[in-house]
Amino acid sequence: MQLRRASKNCAFSVGAIPHFFRLAPSPPPPLPPPRSIRRGHQVYTEVCASCHGLARIAYRNLVGVCFNEDEAKAMAEDKDVMDGPNDEGEMFERPGKLSDYFPSPYPNEEAARFANNGAYPPDLSLIMKARVGGPDYVFALLTGYKDPPAGIEPRDTQYYNPYFPGSWIGMPAPIQDGGVDYEDGTPATATQMAKDVCVFLAWAAEPEADERKLMGFKVMTALTVLSGFMWWYKRKVWSTVKHRRLELY
């Protein structure tokens, strides 16, 4: 990431350089998803979902990744979904289904801004692709809250974070040590929580990534075998033609 200049004794105007957090790519054929996806889902549900939506992910996407079908179905049924109209032309609420998408915490953008002092919490479905640096940026943002430097006055409804463009953000520090109680007993440090939710959001941005890698591996394998066969067939067919003498009488 390109180094950016900051004026003396001032915060970065476009955001500081994030410390690096790398997601290990899955080699083809892909390995089973790590348990951190499930832990990241827990962090999202208990910490992030009250303000941020995940509108492009359905409950069925979780099946076989970090939950089994019964667990995902139970999570969906725990939510009430507005549906309709019914035979009488009225909307109604029903328990969620696997085909339903994660619900938004707010009915519209105006309600979201009103509840957050004018700031609009972005949907997190594609946040890893929508921000330069992806996991690096999100991890640095989540763990980078600190007191403003000397000479900079604090603000009432904003918080200092050098990794956010402009250095002031309307979201308070969302994760703290012990913020969740992990199901698998992993110590819930702020760094661990940030890492897990980054892994989950990276998966959410491309839930079909492993399938695409596997398909690419199969296609490349098939093309390699086909290329070898065509090379052998060409040698076999043209071997007699290349060595044949044409005599004119």
Regions found by a protein language model. Name each.
Residues 1-21:
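N-terminal mitochondrial targeting presequence
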Residues 20-42, 53-64, 72, 209:
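Electrostatic cytochrome c docking/interface patches
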Residues 140-171, 187-191:
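Hydrophobic alpha-helical transmembrane segments and adjacent short intramembrane/lumenal linkers
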Residues 205-222:
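Juxtamembrane/start-of-transmembrane alpha-helix segments at the extracytoplasmic/lumenal side
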Residues 212-215, 227-249:
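Juxtamembrane interface at the cytosolic side of transmembrane helices
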